[in-house]
Curated annotation (Swiss-Prot):
This is Dolichyl-diphosphooligosaccharide--protein glycosyltransferase subunit DAD1. GO terms for cellular component: oligosaccharyltransferase complex. Pathway: Protein modification; protein glycosylation. It is found in: Endoplasmic reticulum membrane. The modification N-acetylserine is found at S2. Residues 52 are lumenal. Component of the oligosaccharyltransferase (OST) complex. OST exists in two different complex forms which contain common core subunits RPN1, RPN2, OST48, OST4, DAD1 and TMEM258, either STT3A or STT3B as catalytic subunits, and form-specific accessory subunits. STT3A complex assembly occurs through the formation of 3 subcomplexes. Subcomplex 1 contains RPN1 and TMEM258, subcomplex 2 contains the STT3A-specific subunits STT3A, DC2/OSTC, and KCP2 as well as the core subunit OST4, and subcomplex 3 contains RPN2, DAD1, and OST48.
């Protein structure tokens, strides 16, 4: 059982490293960073508490929203999904990401107070 799991993981990593464009790898690293930041905030909330509750909610909502926007960007700029997003260039998708991210962070900063 564990040998098959190891072989599946090694094959996944091999194919990911060989066939994924550099642009998507960079975006995946950003997604991992956001995921770890959100997990760290949630762990801190469980261990220490949520005294400044608005601050915790703002940070966590920022992580979740940024993750969702980045996944949307990754889906749109993936070359395998080009047929689904014919009218949207990668530059347009990135501009949409920047605009939505700016709005998200303005709302988050307003929520902090």
């Amino acid at each position: 059982m564990s040998a098959s799991v190891v072989s599946v993981i090694s094959r996944f990593l091999e194919e990911y490293l060989s066939s994924t464009p550099q642009r998507l790898k960079l975006l995946d690293a950003y997604l991992l960073y956001i995921l770890l930041t959100g997990a760290l905030q949630f762990g801190y909330c469980l261990l220490v508490g949520t005294f400044p509750f608005n601050s915790f909610l703002s940070g966590f909502i920022s992580c979740v929203g940024s993750f969702i926007l980045a996944v949307r960007l990754r889906i749109q700029i993936n070359p395998q999904n080009k047929a689904d997003f014919q009218g949207i260039s990668p530059e347009r998708a990135f501009a949409d990401f920047l605009f939505a991210s700016t709005i998200l962070h303005l709302v988050v900063m307003n929520f902090v107070g």
